[in-house]
Swiss-Prot record:
This is Guanine nucleotide-binding protein alpha-3 subunit. GTP binds at residues 152-159, 388-394, 414-418, 483-486, 544. Residues 147-160 are annotated as: G1 motif. Residues 542-547 are annotated as: G5 motif. The lineage of its organism: Eukaryota, Amoebozoa, Evosea, Eumycetozoa, Dictyostelia. Mg(2+) binds at residues 159, 394. GO terms for molecular function: cAMP-dependent protein kinase regulator activity; G protein-coupled receptor binding; G-protein beta/gamma-subunit complex binding; GTP binding; GTPase activity; metal ion binding. Residues 254-321 are annotated as: Disordered. The keyword Chloroplast does not apply. Residues 144-570 form the G-alpha domain. SUPFAM superfamilies: P-loop containing nucleoside triphosphate hydrolases (SSF52540), PH domain-like (SSF50729), Transducin (alpha subunit), insertion domain (SSF47895). The gene is gpaC. Guanine nucleotide-binding proteins (G proteins) are involved as modulators or transducers in various transmembrane signaling systems. G alpha-3 plays a role in development. G alpha-3 mutants fail to aggregate. It comes from Dictyostelium discoideum. Residues 410-419 are annotated as: G3 motif.
Amino acid sequence: MDFNPVPPPRETLRAYLSKKGHVVKNWKLRLFVLKPGSSYMEYFVDETKEQQHLPQGRVPLYGTRVMEYVYNSNNNPREFCLSVETENKNWIISTGSKAQQLEWIEAIKHAIESAVETDEIKLQKHKSIEKQLQLDGKNKNKIPVLKLLLLGTGESGKSTVVKQMKILHHKGFSKEEEEFYRNLIYINLLDGMALLIHVIKENNIEIPQETLSAIKNYSSWYRVYIEKRNKNGIRNNPIGSMIPISILNNNKDNNNSNSSSLKNNSGGSSSSELDKKMTHLSLDGSTCINSNSASPNGPSSSTTTSTINTHNRSNSDGSSNNIFNVQDFGIPPIITNYISTIWSDPVVQSEVMLQAQKYHINESTQYYLNEIKRIGKPTYQPVNLDILKSRATTNGVVETDFNVNGEVIFRIVDVAGQRGERKKWINFFDDVTAIVFVAAINEYDQKLVEDNCTNRLHESLNLFDSICNDSTFPKTSIILFLNKIDLFREKLKRTSINICFPDYNGDQSYEKSSNYIKNNFLSKKKGGNGINSQNFIYFHFTCATDTKSFETVFNSVRDIIISKTLEFYC
């Protein structure tokens, strides 16, 4: 006999139902109450106890699944039963008819979808996990190592997750790491400004004369800086930076006669000639025009290669070469002034920045430019947020161990997300405890760097599809981080997700848009309907650069992973 689906209850659902005890024949009649929007289903001895709000027990609904409990004369002497299962316990409840059974199953399913994990549930779960680990004799003197595979497309925020783990469980970054990231931040900032100049030139964007003058001076300096940075190799260039070709190509000229458009006035000189001819800039920010000044490559101005002094990088011997040695001496004050002048132009912050999205500009560029006065100081040392915002392409595989509260070691394997790197993933699928998949939901209107054609969010969805349905790990838990919600909120103000999902007909609110994207990801899991098809997928909306919110998310993830793997250690 077919039954029509029961609509979600709009009012409290109440009924006397039988609950099975520890013994098959031990059934107790209880008054079950399910309120709309509640994260619990409560049961009482009778109406009096309900009025006094003295429940006999509670059935938590967060992370729970409900299904029909099939009648069997051996294991269940009653018909029309349903089973409500949590991670550690299950309830078998008998209803009075098939219609009532379906009504309660559907009502509980709808309640599960909106249920939230309360502090009480979190505390109970955490205590249960700690107790079981302490009682596990096999691991009394051994901390288990749980392997997490960190996957996702390029620039989704995977490496930022690892950085947050360092902050939370490695007591931050070492001096060597801070020095590396300081140089990386300089590169991100300087290359970001160069790309904005490239955008102005390519799109013939009109700008004020003051900004134009600062751009010309910055461009002249940047061309020599890049040549020297590339010559010095990895020490000065920890990433394979994509330099805008119009900044380096001195032969290309903009024929626009408008004085407010950007032109290249180098006259086809090589970088070495520019080095000799350009204005001699001193590190204290003064400008000294001296056509007879010695070449920076000469004996009197050799490149500084001594040990880095992070407390006094501005201490200079007066060599013109130091103006290009950003790693050892920081960004020269006069270059900082040029950058400030360019960035303070409203046209640059609005029209140019918007156009730059088409050129795959680093998402952190705006943040660094807003902080240019602080970053441009000779004594600059990066704070955690600066490091979290830094961007370098991950090549190959990076494994990092984190001891979490002495309970467990998480071995996070960060694998490069670019298309050409994904073939390496298969080598790390063995012994995987869980997969953490990071998807940048703000990329719904962006194209892949690899082909400048494929929509980034579609690429992420397709990749998630292939991973969560891979036969290599059919029962492996998958933690889905729907990342960069801060950038997603901002982008929604000007662009609807309809550009990526033509079938979407909702408004541009964060709640509806993010929920639609979430459902698109969860629907990729095959092998069942409803909640049963998502048994091993746990999702979180994240901002990986926000340490406080990320700590809350990771604590929840930690409990899920540990509880799911306890059986392997017991």
